[in-house]
């Protein structure tokens, strides 16, 4: 099954999907910067492990799961197909979430600030940029176990929202919200550098937030 990964990470997995016999494999995306570009916030070592090992593992597992589902469907093995689909969902989430995460980061010197339209929306919906950051930090730090904190756009309510998703659940399919920026709080995202100090990592990540990308996502989501 070939996935079309957009800024919202749209994905339909379940009853209604098809598998091509000439399926293209998913590949680990190149980072838009070097492993050391996010220092001192994220070390080159943690970036190499996180991207080159953990994200790569999700990509490989997704390819394997898709192949297993294809084989199970060909054999008429419903039980194996269902089990394989669960693995596809999990690893698709890991692949898309990480892709959005990497794209939303940049070197400290390039972080910038929200464009005027996004800043206006932030002030309207949260009062100030600092208040929004504090609220998302608190929600993200409080995640039990592993998961993701999100700044998102609610197209129905026409406003910004904050959300958290456990494990590798995808934001838009589970909440209807369109992702703008995400914070990974799986331990592999920070433990090598920040040890058990998740709050320090979450607060520091904003120093490398790519506000140009986040602003562009907002404009696109708003339509």
From Swiss-Prot:
InterPro entries: Fe/Mn_Superoxide_Dismutase, Mn/Fe_SOD, Mn/Fe_SOD_BS, Mn/Fe_SOD_C, Mn/Fe_SOD_N, Mn/Fe_SOD_N_sf, SOD_C_sf. It is found in: Mitochondrion matrix. GO terms for molecular function: manganese ion binding; superoxide dismutase activity. Residues 1-24 form a transit peptide. It catalyses: 2 superoxide + 2 H(+) = H2O2 + O2. Its EC number is 1.15.1.1. Mn(2+) binds at residues 50, 98, 184, 188. PROSITE patterns: SOD_MN. Binds 1 Mn(2+) ion per subunit. Its cofactor is Mn(2+). GO terms for cellular component: mitochondrial matrix. The keyword Transcription does not apply. Pfam families: Sod_Fe_C, Sod_Fe_N. Keywords: Manganese, Metal-binding, Mitochondrion, Oxidoreductase, Transit peptide. Gene3D superfamilies: Fe,Mn superoxide dismutase (SOD) domain, Iron/manganese superoxide dismutase, C-terminal domain. The keyword Transferase does not apply. Belongs to the iron/manganese superoxide dismutase family. Destroys superoxide anion radicals which are normally produced within the cells and which are toxic to biological systems. Homotetramer. This is Superoxide dismutase [Mn], mitochondrial. It comes from Onchocerca volvulus.
């Amino acid at each position: 099954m070939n996935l079309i990964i957009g800024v919202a990470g749209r994905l339909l997995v379940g009853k209604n999907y098809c598998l091509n016999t000439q399926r293209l494999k998913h590949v680990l995306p190149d980072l838009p910067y070097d492993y050391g570009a996010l220092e001192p916030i994220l070390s080159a070592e943690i970036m190499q492990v996180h991207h080159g090992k953990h994200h790569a593992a999700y990509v490989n597992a997704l390819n394997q799961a898709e192949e297993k589902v294809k084989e199970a469907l060909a054999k008429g093995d419903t039980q194996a197909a269902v089990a394989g689909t669960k693995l596809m969902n999990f690893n698709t989430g890991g692949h898309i979430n990480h892709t959005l995460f990497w794209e939303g980061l940049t070197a400290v010197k390039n972080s910038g600030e929200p464009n005027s339209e996004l800043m206006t929306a932030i002030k309207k919906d949260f009062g100030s940029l600092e208040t929004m950051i504090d609220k998302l930090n608190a929600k993200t730090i409080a995640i039990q176990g592993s998961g993701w904190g999100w700044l998102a756009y609610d197209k129905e309510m026409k406003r910004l929202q904050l959300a958290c998703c456990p494990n590798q659940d995808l934001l838009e399919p589970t909440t209807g919200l369109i992702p703008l920026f995400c914070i990974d709080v799986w331990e592999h995202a920070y433990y090598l550098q920040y040890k058990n100090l998740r709050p320090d990592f979450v607060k520091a990540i904003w120093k490398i937030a790519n506000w140009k990308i986040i602003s562009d996502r907002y404009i696109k989501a708003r339509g």
